[in-house]
Amino acid sequence: MSSLGNLTVLTGPSGVGKGTIVRKILESHSDVWLSISATTRQPRSGEIDGEHYFFLEKKQFQEIIDKDGFLEWASFSNNFYGTPKKIVKEKIEKGTNVLLEIELEGARQIRKSFPEAFQIFLAPPNLYELEKRIRGRGTETEESIRDRLSIAEKELIAQKEFDAVVINEDIEKAFKEIEGFMGLKL
């Protein structure tokens, strides 16, 4: 009988480097599966059902909510998004390590629905550096930057709720630290 996999939740403010860390983990560790969210929004060009998202009708999504079938779910821009419980549990039971990149409220829901998950908060060295990174993307309006920084200030207060806090001052160091928390072999 193989040993169980683990669920690791990665949270942090927009622009902190979560996506980069996730890509590095997936490139380095074929035994890690990135959880796929379900959504009621329409697929964008090039998105594949079951690969990028599980695309559902609102009625289907509501049925899953009613059956307590999500680890977490939320409504955003008139659409629903959620993490299906069944596939995550199946992967863990087969010994696969599951990684979930999610926002703060979702992480809080998972703390209740799957308390054995290891939760990591990825933090910037400071808000000035975070602002520099967000501006460096070149994709945000001034209003969006202000909104993201305001949300980030609130999220940073919540880092004490997490099992581990990793300061992303250097992407390689942060990556190695998260690998260690996930118990991944080199």
From Swiss-Prot:
SUPFAM superfamilies for this protein: P-loop containing nucleoside triphosphate hydrolases
GO cellular component: cytosol
Keywords for this protein: ATP-binding, Cytoplasm, Kinase, Nucleotide-binding, Transferase
Subcellular location: Cytoplasm
Catalytic activity entry: GMP + ATP = GDP + ADP
Listed HAMAP family: Guanylate_kinase (MF_00328)
Family: Belongs to the guanylate kinase family.
Protein's recorded name: Guanylate kinase
Organism of derivation: Prochlorococcus marinus (strain NATL2A)
InterPro entries cross-referenced by the UniProt entry: GK/Ca_channel_bsu (IPR008145), Guanylate_kin-like_dom (IPR008144), Guanylate_kinase (IPR017665), Guanylate_kinase_CS (IPR020590), P-loop_NTPase (IPR027417)
Domain Guanylate kinase-like: 5-183
Gene Ontology molecular function terms on file: ATP binding; guanylate kinase activity
Binding site for ATP: 12-19
Major localization listed first in the record, in broad terms: cytoplasm
SMART domains per UniProt: GuKc
Assigned EC number: 2.7.4.8
Keyword Cytoplasm listed: yes
Domain of life: Bacteria
The protein's enzyme class: transferase
